[in-house]
Each structure stands twice: as structure tokens, then as C-alpha cells.
């Protein structure tokens, strides 16, 4: 019987190589990617990258899988509830490609922990965190790194339902996204600005209002947010795959 493991790399990427060529596939395989936040957006981004041939990914998140994650987060299933998110996702990614180098960090990104991640060692840094304060700090630090390190940020994916309104643009050109607006306001208030331009994935759709009762999630042990917004898998997954696409296209362009 054919050894599935030893033939994995050649077999699973034959369609990628057929489309992009051997040289581009090798570039993809050698890229180093750091993903902050592996929830509804980041988990799908990681999967898209691994399936496209990226071998070296570090995933960062401090949370455990909660039952309410099961509607949108890749690794969240009835079996993984209670597990550390990055561990569950790492296992999933290694099932896709056992030869991948997936580093799982159960840590929270904050100004106090930023130096622990050695961002200068990566080719791509993906921001998929939703804390305004921490996101702002990450943006400032990532855009201060050398220009060969590409930074991509996800804006708000909650409270939307139309995947055909998802776009990409430079941060200062994002229109209609409350998260981007709050970030820009924060930068202006503090008089600290990103050192360079960077691409964001966002939605032009006007955010909806939660139609359900907030008490549905008031006892959600896996979240410390004062306000929890509804979200849908086809939106968060589209955000994540769009970011994966930006990374892949940047590698081969």
C-alpha cells in the first residue's frame, strides 16, 4: 500500500504546482507566517495557507475552544470544546500536512508580550485579533518592522452577512468599518501613527444590529468582552481566506 505520509508533499501540492509552477510553489513553501488570533478569521487563514503549500506558520492565541465557537471557527467541534485553540488548530493543520512546521503559542498579544514573538523573523504577519488596544499596538509595531515583512490586518467581520461586500484596501482608505474608524481615531488622539501603509480586509456592508437576546451569551465562559456581537461562518471564513490569498499572491508576484 502506498505510504500516505511520504507521498504527502508531492501529492497534495500537484494542483498548486500545476497552476503556479515549481519555482512559485517553492517560494510558498519557504515563507514564514505569524498569525495573531486564530478565531473566526485567523483559523481559516491558517488552513488556507497550509493547503496552499505554506509550511512554516506560528499561531498565537490564548483562548480555549468554547461551544459558541462552533458556528464559525475552523477547529471548534463537539470534540475539541475545552481544548487550547492553538493546540486544536495545530493538530488540524498537521493532519493536512504532517511535514508542516506549525508552532502553537498559547499567549495573548499585548504591548507587554510583543517582544516575545520575534516578529522580525517572519515574512508575513497577520493581525486577526479583535481587542482595539492590542490591535492598535500590533499595527504600530508591525509597520515599524523592515519593509520586506508584509503586514495584513483584518477589520471587523462580525455583524455582517453578505460575503460579496468583502474588500481589500490600504488601511487609511477603509470606508464604513467601525473598527478601522476607532483605530484611526486612537492613532490621531495619541499622535502615534503606523510607519507605513498596509493592506486590510474589510466589509463595505453596514454592520447589522444583534437581533437576538444578549442574555444568550452572557454566561459565555470563553469570552471576557462586555459586548458580544453575532457573526457568521461564511463571513469570517471569507475574511480569513481573503487574507490567505493576499499572502499567496504577494509571494508569487
What are these regions (language model features)?
Residues 54, 59-97:
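Glycine-rich phosphate-binding loop and adjoining beta1-alpha1-beta2 segment
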Residues 2-6, 120-124, 129-135, 151, ...:
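Glycine-rich phosphate/adenylate-binding loop
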Residues 106-114:
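Conserved SAM/SAH-binding loop
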Residues 1-34:
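N-terminal charged helix/coil linker that caps or initiates catalytic domains
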Residues 50-56, 147-148:
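Conserved S-adenosyl-L-methionine
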Residues 35-37, 60:
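Conserved N-terminal Rossmann-fold NAD(P)-binding element of oxidoreductases
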Residues 41:
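Hydrophobic/small residue at the entry helix of a nucleotide-binding pocket
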Amino acid at each position: 500500500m502506498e505510504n500516505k505520509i511520504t507521498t504527502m508533499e508531492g501529492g497534495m501540492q500537484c494542483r498548486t504546482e500545476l497552476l503556479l509552477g515549481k519555482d512559485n510553489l517553492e517560494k510558498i513553501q519557504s515563507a514564514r507566517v505569524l498569525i495573531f488570533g486564530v478565531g473566526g478569521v485567523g483559523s481559516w487563514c491558517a488552513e488556507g495557507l497550509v493547503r496552499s503549500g505554506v509550511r512554516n506558520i506560528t499561531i498565537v492565541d490564548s483562548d480555549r475552544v468554547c461551544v459558541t465557537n462552533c458556528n464559525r471557527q475552523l477547529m471548534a467541534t463537539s470534540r475539541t470544546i475545552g481544548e487550547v485553540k492553538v493546540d486544536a488548530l495545530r493538530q488540524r493543520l498537521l493532519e493536512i500536512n504532517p511535514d508542516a512546521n506549525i508552532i502553537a503559542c498559547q499567549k495573548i498579544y499585548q504591548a507587554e508580550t510583543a517582544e516575545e514573538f520575534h516578529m522580525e523573523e517572519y515574512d508575513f504577519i497577520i493581525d486577526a485579533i479583535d481587542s482595539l488596544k492590542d490591535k492598535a499596538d500590533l499595527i504600530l509595531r508591525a509597520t515599524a518592522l523592515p519593509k520586506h515583512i508584509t503586514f495584513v490586518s483584518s477589520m471587523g467581520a462580525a455583524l455582517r452577512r453578505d460575503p460579496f461586500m468583502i474588500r481589500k484596501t490600504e488601511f487609511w482608505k477603509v470606508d464604513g468599518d467601525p473598527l478601522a474608524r476607532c483605530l484611526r481615531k486612537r492613532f490621531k488622539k495619541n499622535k502615534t501613527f503606523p510607519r507605513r501603509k498596509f493592506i486590510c480586509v474589510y466589509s463595505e456592508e453596514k454592520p447589522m444590529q444583534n437581533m437576538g437576546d444578549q442574555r444568550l451569551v452572557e454566561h459565555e465562559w470563553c469570552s471576557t468582552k462586555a459586548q458580544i456581537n453575532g457573526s457568521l461562518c461564511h463571513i469570517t471564513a471569507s475574511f480569513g481566506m481573503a487574507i490567505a490569498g493576499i499572502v499567496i499572491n504577494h509571494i508569487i508576484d
